[in-house]
A protein has these predicted regions:
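S-adenosylmethionine/decaboxylated-SAM
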Residues: 2-155
Length: 155
């Protein structure tokens, strides 16, 4: 993902599912090189607190906007002008399809979506895969790395 961000010169990235901040740190390190920012959403307050500390320790807290709350509620609260050119999804698997539908109005014309655990949680994310497949705006591939990831490109 670090390479995607640098190659695409990403300016505004969104992470749905912060957890302890591990993925967000890698995203933020790449965004520091592009001059971009990361917005990251986590439901659990304790995880968000740990992530904030990890962002600070790793020196990326200046490019990270952590938001604690339900991803669907947070996404619904975004201003219509808030746009993202990269989205990483690694949260409640059954909600992936909802996240996809909710983020589409906030994507730039050439946005990239990366969704984790596509193979390991196939039954829970099948409706998401079907939605991406049915959407003519997106081309996608499923990469058979551990857990599996779906990479969808709008354009």
């Amino acid at each position: 993902m670090n390479s995607f961000i640098k190659m695409m010169n990403v300016q505004n990235a969104l992470e749905i599912g912060t957890s302890n901040g591990y993925s967000g740190i890698w995203l933020a390190k790449a965004l520091k090189q592009t001059g971009g920012k990361l917005t990251t959403i986590e439901f659990y307050e304790k995880r968000q607190s740990i992530a904030k500390e990890n962002f600070k320790i790793c020196g990326v807290d200046d490019v990270v906007r952590p938001i604690q709350g339900s991803a669907c509620e947070v996404l619904a609260s975004f201003d219509e002008n808030e746009k993202f050119d990269f989205v990483f999804i690694d949260a409640c698997k059954r909600e992936y399809v909802k996240y996809f539908e909710m983020i589409k109005p906030h994507l730039t014309p050439k946005a990239l979506i990366v969704a984790d655990n596509i193979i390991s949680h196939a039954a829970k994310v099948q409706d998401f895969i079907d939605a991406v497949d049915a959407d003519d705006e997106f081309q996608y591939e499923i990469l058979e790395v551990p857990g599996g990831i779906l990479v969808a490109y709008r354009g």
